[in-house]
Amino acid sequence: PGVRRNERLPLLVMLHGCGQDAEALAASSRMNLVAARERFFVLYPEQDRLSNAAGCWNWYDTRSGRAQAEAGSIDAAIRQVCLLQAVDPERIALAGLSAGAGMAALLALRHPDRFRAIAMHSGIAPGVAHSSATALMAMCGQRAAPISPERLASEARLPGLLVIQGSSDPVVAPSNGAEAVRLWAARGGAKAGARRIVQRGARYAAVITDYRSRSRVVATLCEIEGLGHAW
């Protein structure tokens, strides 16, 4: 978007899923059109195929340090964009699809004060996987044990979370979306409000549940009826 003198605009960081690249996510999400209309910057980091042949972010590989290294590279890219463009550092948000959602969650947990909000689309709840095998199990809705909310982050307040999950997702079990929201809500002392159904025209209906702590929305679960593993 055209930036006026002394103006600072928000930044949205979009993280692609497996088998995608930055260009594919930009095209499927049409986020550039939204950014031009609503006036914000978009950054599309791209996974190195030498790091993962399928183009997946290694969000789960925290034991070897690969996940943290990739998160650090993305964070460095964000810092660089903030130096080069008129970005408002107080209005930076993360969004990710599938493996990108897992990496977005990791970034938010590592830097809870850096980001205003995070959106996880068809992703895995943070902390439930630490290897490719456990990641695949989590995708199928299997996990060894529930994760304690206290393990998520330090005492810093987590950024607001939006989880988008399709009810017909054949890749990531819908229970993962609910688990991510459960962890975020428990960590923030939030309670679920009444579910509401939103449908616009012939689009898929969305069942939305807000989790609030007093007046603040800590997390929102958006379950889209009939949606598969797609933006």
Where are these regions (language model features)?
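Serine-hydrolase catalytic machinery in alpha/beta-hydrolase-like enzymes
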Residues: 1-3, 7-93, 97, 102-116, ...
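A generic secondary-structure signal marking the coil-to-beta-strand transition
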Residues: 11, 39-41, 160, 217-220
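The conserved beta1-alpha1 loop
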Residues: 13-17, 122, 165-166, 225
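Short, charged low-complexity intrinsically disordered segments located at boundaries
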Residues: 65, 103-105, 109, 209-221
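Hydrophobic anchor at the start of a short beta-strand
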Residues: 92, 118, 161, 219
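The feature captures the conserved acid-bearing segment of alpha/beta-hydrolase catalytic domains
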Residues: 126-217, 223-229
